[in-house]
Structure formats: C-alpha cells, structure tokens
Amino acid sequence: MLDKFIMSCTRQLVGSSDKKRKKTQKPLDGVDVARDIMTENEPVFYDVYRDRARQGALPVIFDIHGGGWVYGDKALNDVYITHLARRGYAVVSPEYRLLADGADLKAQIKDLSDCMADAYKRREELGLDFSRAYLAGDSAGGHLATLLWSIAHSERLQALYGVQAPPFSVRAIGLSHPVPDPAAKLGGVMGANLRMLQKHFSKDPEILQNMSICRFAKEIPLPKIFLISCGKDALSPLSVDFAHWLEENGAEYVFKFYDKKDHPKLSHVFDVAFPHYEESQQAISEMLDFFEKA
C-alpha cells in the first residue's frame, strides 16, 4: 500500500510540474502527427510525427518517454519530438503500461515491442525507412531502450521476456540522463525510490537478474550510444558509471556531459523537457550527427 501511495504521489507531483512547464511551450509548426495508431495484439497505441514538407520514407527514431516507469504517456515528449521531426526524422512515440497501474517490466517490454513491430508492418503507409532506425530514451525510457536492444540480440532474453526480435536493425541509441541499471547503487531519495521499485519490476527473480544491459556485455554486441547528462541531475552518477562501463567493454559511444558550474540551469532530461535551450539544441544536433554516422 505504501509503495502504491508513493507511486501515486510521484505521478501527481511530476504530472503537475509537467503541465506547468508545457503551458509555456508549444510544439514546432510544420509537423504532422498520426495519432492513436493501435497495434493488433493489444490495445496499445503509438503516434508518428513527420515534417510536413518532407516526402517519402524518412529515417525512424523510436522515442521512449521517461517517468520513472510509473508516469507518462506517448504525448509527454511531444514538444521535443517536433524538434527531431523538423530535422528530417519520422519519430514514433509509443505508449506502454506503467508500474503504477499494476504492470510489470515484462508488460512494458511487450508493449514497446508490439509498437515497433506494428510500425514496421505499416512502414509504407507511414513513410518509415527502417534501413535507418534508431532508439532514443530519457531517464527510465533510457533503461527500456537499452533493454530492448539487449533482448533483440539474445534469443535467451527473447524467451524470458516473451517477445520476438524486431524485424529490423537499430543503428544507434540516444540516451538522455538514463537509468541503465535500475538495480545500481545510488544514494538519496532517487536511490530509495529505485530500491522501492525493485519488487514492482517483476516477481520473477530471473527477470530481476536480467533487466539491465550492464549484465550482458559478453552475450550481445553493444550498441553505438550517444549519452547526455548534466552535473545538476541527481541521477548523473549513473550516467558517469555507464560511460565507464561502455569504455571498459569497448563500445562506441559519445558522452556529452554539462557540468553544474558552467551550466547551472540544466537539470534532469533538460534536452527533452526544454528543447529550446541553446545547450539542448547543441545536444540534439550532436546526437543526430552521431546517428547519421552510425
């Protein structure tokens, strides 16, 4: 009961903050959105954003929203997504069930996998070029993005999570202030919250032992990763540790870190929450350049 109360409070507090923030923002003009596309397997929906002026099939970014696994929906990152779309990408924004509503990690992976497969099936209708496909995720969405990559490259994990590998290859992943390993040690309120969530990710101990890309360095090929973080973010130690892990395991990556002294206004997922910031535009540009070279 206490856990559900905490998740409910988190959802209300973050939701209130996001509503206040989004009242001061608006999506960029010139972007068309195909909304509420429903997958065949479950009543799971996704949206697709495209620059109105561009014709034909466009490279695809699957953007997985954050929200601590307990909050958010496919419209949460809509302003940020329009900044990606205006730069020539078709952006798929999937919905997934939340821990606060009684779902578990396996259900979240299933929803996201279904959205990816359905978008591929409709690629001609939606104008999606899957020869240039990328994943992006912020905060908890970063965890889900890297876990999806891991599952796609492991038959063992596909069996464990009850999903199939996507029918296309992902060329690179963009991560904003991610939680690559939800079981990582972290102090303070954020660390306490991660520890509380452990029992809600799954009741299956095998899932709990296999829910982070950091466990699979010898089992899967590692993705090319563009990693963004900042010193004011309480979760930044996780990004720093992840960058070290990528380095130790020979992954191709870029770590874009904005220190607190020179960038005092930047906080958790600033590039997604405030894409109009100069630093956000810089980070977005460099991430997309990284994608194009992947």
Stretches found by the model and what they are:
Residues M1-A294:
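Alpha/beta-hydrolase superfamily serine-hydrolase fold, recognizing
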